[in-house]
Amino acid sequence: MSELHYLYGKPTGTADLRTVNSDFIVKEILPFSPSGEGEHHLVHIRKDGLNTVQVAEMLAKFAKVHPKEVTYAGQKDKNAITEQWFGIRIPGKETPAWIELNSDRLTVLSSSRHSKKLRIGALLGNRFILTLRNVTNVEDIISRIEKVSQIGVPNYFGEQRFGHDGKNLVLGRQMLAGKKVKDRNKRSMYLSAVRSHLFNTVVSYRLTHYGTRPLAGDCVMLAGSKSFFVTPEWDLVVLKRLIEKDIQLSAPLWGRGKMLPQGEAAEVETQAMADLTEDCYGLEHAGLEQERRPLLLEPQGLKHEQTSDGLVLEFILPAGCFATSLLRELVDYQDVKELQWQTTLTAETNVVTESNTAAANVSDNGESAS
């Protein structure tokens, strides 16, 4: 992520993120209210130090159903406190006593029956409450908050999408080159990493060379939807819609089909992807269709408060957008939980290396003596 373009220049303020799980709070916002009847149970859960899959498995075991009967709208971080909805299909059975699941790491906030399955992406957005500790140059951060509130930030896919040390991108490229991956969820995750990297590359290239100005032939999206249309030329009517944020500039989620923008915008995207032709080819032949994603991310209700713990940020992002992509424009932060993971991994690797070296020395000594 460090090589991607900063819209306001690299921040001069620094801070620690996720010193403890409560420094990173996420609350899902559903686009509907549970109907109160039906064979699907919607359970609203607060989890601390658990990932989404772990909770889904706990729910399946408790309800005595197959894990495939448990669904969720999106995955949430493990190293955080998150409030998330789960759907469990339990036809013809009484409502389980969900509250019995409560523990020091999991709390059932509410539950209700619903008539429809909870599907991936069925979210209006997420509310974030982040606490930054050991903050320096807070004046620069606050100045950036004001700019971000007006213009937004690059809508990059965050580091989480690519896995630790970018391994999902590496494995995705290996898969596109022919390596077999049996697990369906892993295949999807690896494909998504390659596609997301391509999107980030195009966004960074465009912002580096052209800023946020519109280009002839742009493919623009209707705000709040996935619908889009091409603008061969920017007349005053269309430009007014962009200024009023009724439409948004976009970048490609690559797949098969002809390039959607035209003219100058198409040329810019082609230039940006010039070194990624193998990624493009692989995604086209993986069965993905071309889609678009907004170029910029505009947070709602972005506010800050200085407390005894540090600087607290609160904002709402649309589903599928990353808080860390917003944060990187505000402050040069270090993720404490990620650093702890890296330290543990390095220590474990050193132990294995030392063990292997010792075993090799014993083997060498044995061969010399024989």
Curated annotation (Swiss-Prot):
Its EC number is 5.4.99.27. The keyword Isomerase applies. It comes from the Bacteria. GO terms for cellular component: cytosol. The active site is at 77 (nucleophile). Pfam families: TruD. Residues 152-297 form the TRUD domain. It catalyses: uridine(13) in tRNA = pseudouridine(13) in tRNA. Keywords: Isomerase, tRNA processing. GO terms for biological process: pseudouridine synthesis; tRNA pseudouridine synthesis. GO terms for molecular function: pseudouridine synthase activity; RNA binding; tRNA pseudouridine(13) synthase activity. It is an enzyme of class 5 (isomerase). Belongs to the pseudouridine synthase TruD family. Responsible for synthesis of pseudouridine from uracil-13 in transfer RNAs. This is tRNA pseudouridine synthase D.
